[in-house]
């Protein structure tokens, strides 16, 4: 069975005109007849290409301010016609076959992303004819080639060159898959937008106002992720896995990072690298975060990245073995040398990597070196957690407090140095699994207690960690990701030598907790913000 199909007639109708002129010129050189609409047709005609307006092809003008342009049997019959089966019907209705459809859709996403977008603006950017043609061509991929991405123009031309102006079923099927994904994402965006609007009063005279109150979350949740890579296995070797990225998020991340060298990233590598990178983003000055099993085991500020790394490593060298290291500045040669000479590391990630640092890390061929780019601001987005039979959706935890937000509740006021350490410690605690306790001193973690069912045991573990590494807890500060339900955590901290505590507050026993701090001569501040992490 011959599955190669010649392209003799193409319909081009695009909102994003990137590369369309050059593509059309190449099609014309192949002898392809060009049909087009609106602005696309004008662009091609202005550059001397023979183009037939869709309205001339159908014999029916565009109507309703362009809302109806291509919804016509001569268009859709030409796309949907089954070659070798529907020729008699086509001849009877004067329908000509359309072999290639090149369409991308009205820019709905960028329209509604504009804070000044009205409901009317959104409605006028809902494409009707475009998705209809895309779906028709994708459905009939047995005979028709559909292109929705400008990045595929060169691929189609290469295919035509190889096959004397024709395309194979293989490429048509692959392009059809991309087309269905494209329309699914488009419809999902529209459904999400409208699902976020709550009808206040259907009988109001001001329809725009009635429909423009926004809800927190849509009635149905539509999101599309694109597979970036298959993974060797999942969290455990008996689990299959793949890594998908969110095309709507434009932010420096492990998902957008470029791997410069090393073995393929594993499922756990990706999860741990995300935890390390998101933590280090919290700091302005040179900072290093070392993560093991999604928990920071060492975090520090420094006069430069080398100093920050040395101090972060000092917190827990044992746990740092085989860990993930993240920086918030360009990885330099000195820091790279210190890492590869000192420890086994799975992943290093930084906004950028100097050539000298690349050359040094290259000596350890298995080390995964990632460059994620600089970050300016954090993108507002959602966190997801699957439960059996459902999905939990919430805003990302981007909350953080500054000096103006905290409240001193103890008799003793924190010193200026303690306040700096408190805010540093609080940033770290946000990224430690609950129950989370972090000891810190002079911009460096001293001990980290993570993931315990009892808060007091997390505090004890942080102290044990510090003791094991010979770090002095005396006059360190402590952060707790949630309030203390009993005074035992305060007593344990005092016994370890903690001088100051930062915590959310909000316990029914707050007075008892504050009294305990006062008894020990400790300073205590409340943030009014919790940072549970599960």
Swiss-Prot record:
Lineage: Bacteria, Pseudomonadati, Pseudomonadota, Gammaproteobacteria, Alteromonadales
SUPFAM superfamilies: Cytidine deaminase-like (SSF53927), Methylglyoxal synthase-like (SSF52335)
Recorded family membership: Belongs to the PurH family.
Coiled-coil residue windows: none
EC assignment: 2.1.2.3, 3.5.4.10
GO molecular function, one term: IMP cyclohydrolase activity
Keyword Hydrolase in record: yes
GO annotation, cellular component aspect: cytosol
Top-rank lineage group of the source organism: Bacteria
The keyword Hydrolase belongs to this UniProt entry's keyword annotation: yes
Notes on the domains: The IMP cyclohydrolase activity resides in the N-terminal region.
MGS-like domain ranges (all copies): 1-148
Encoding gene (name): purH
Reactions catalysed: (6R)-10-formyltetrahydrofolate + 5-amino-1-(5-phospho-beta-D-ribosyl)imidazole-4-carboxamide = 5-formamido-1-(5-phospho-D-ribosyl)imidazole-4-carboxamide + (6S)-5,6,7,8-tetrahydrofolate; IMP + H2O = 5-formamido-1-(5-phospho-D-ribosyl)imidazole-4-carboxamide
GO biological process: 'de novo' IMP biosynthetic process
SMART domains, per the entry: AICARFT_IMPCHas, MGS
Keyword annotations: Hydrolase, Multifunctional enzyme, Purine biosynthesis, Transferase
Protein name (record): Bifunctional purine biosynthesis protein PurH
Pathway the protein takes part in: Purine metabolism; IMP biosynthesis via de novo pathway; 5-formamido-1-(5-phospho-D-ribosyl)imidazole-4-carboxamide from 5-amino-1-(5-phospho-D-ribosyl)imidazole-4-carboxamide (10-formyl THF route): step 1/1; Purine metabolism; IMP biosynthesis via de novo pathway; IMP from 5-formamido-1-(5-phospho-D-ribosyl)imidazole-4-carboxamide: step 1/1
